[in-house]
UniProtKB/Swiss-Prot annotation:
SUPFAM superfamilies: VC0467-like (SSF143456)
InterPro entries according to UniProt: AlgH-like
Protein name: UPF0301 protein Rv0038
GO cellular component, one term: cytosol
Organism of origin: Mycobacterium tuberculosis (strain ATCC 25618 / H37Rv)
Family membership noted in the UniProt record: Belongs to the UPF0301 (AlgH) family.
Length: 202
């Protein structure tokens, strides 16, 4: 049974058939490049111009208050900037999870991505948005691919394409999001969650 303040999509992610806005890219166990190792990327845009996403599980030590103090109140814990990727690290991008039943249409500064996820214009007034969103996450930089580049990496098995839950974006500071996403998948994919973090332990 779903509580009044919850939405069915909070618990059951729809099956991901292909890359699109609102899907996750999960780094495969063989992807050892430090920037993306065990990363979980939320796809914000995927179109003829390429693909843009943000890494959900790379918190920085920089407090949101020190960079964008007006957004600190709405920022989800741990209220730090997250490293969205290697592209334009001096630029900020913001995602928010809408409250159940909230409609982003007509709310200045919100652009719908998928489900209850929206992009937020950081020039908007946080006080105006507060009633519509559960929380925001602000990313320094993003991850980007040109046309065909991501498809090649997926064919090479660098990435696993999966569906997202709203809670993935606002995940807590100590959570192993990579493992959490895998554990909710059917067998045999869920077994990858047992893959050791430190390969030297294996």
């Amino acid at each position: 049974m779903v509580a009044p303040h919850e939405d069915p999509e909070d618990h059951v992610a729809p099956a991901a058939q292909r890359v699109r806005a609102g899907t996750l890219l999960l780094a495969n166990t063989d992807l050892l490049e430090p920037t993306f190792r065990r990363s979980v990327i939320y796809i914000v845009e995927h179109n003829d111009g390429g693909t843009l996403g943000v890494v959900l599980n790379r918190p920085s030590e920089t407090a949101v208050y020190n960079v964008l103090p007006q957004w600190a109140k709405l920022a989800a814990k741990p209220k730090t900037m997250f490293i969205g990727g290697p592209v334009k690290r001096d630029a900020a991008l913001c995602l928010a999870v809408l409250r159940v039943g909230a409609d982003p249409e007509g709310v200045p500064g919100l652009r719908h991505v998928a489900g209850r996820l929206v992009m937020v214009d950081l020039d908007a007034d946080p006080e105006v948005l507060a009633a519509a969103v559960e929380g925001v996450r602000i990313y320094a930089g993003y991850s980007g691919w040109t046309i065909g580049q991501l498809e090649g990496e997926i064919e090479r098995d660098d990435w696993i394409v999966l569906s997202a839950l709203p809670s993935d974006v606002l995940v807590g500071p100590r959570a192993d999001l990579w493992g959490q996403v895998l554990r909710r998948q059917p067998l045999p994919l869920s077994l990858l969650a047992t893959h050791p973090i430190d390969l030297s332990r294996n």
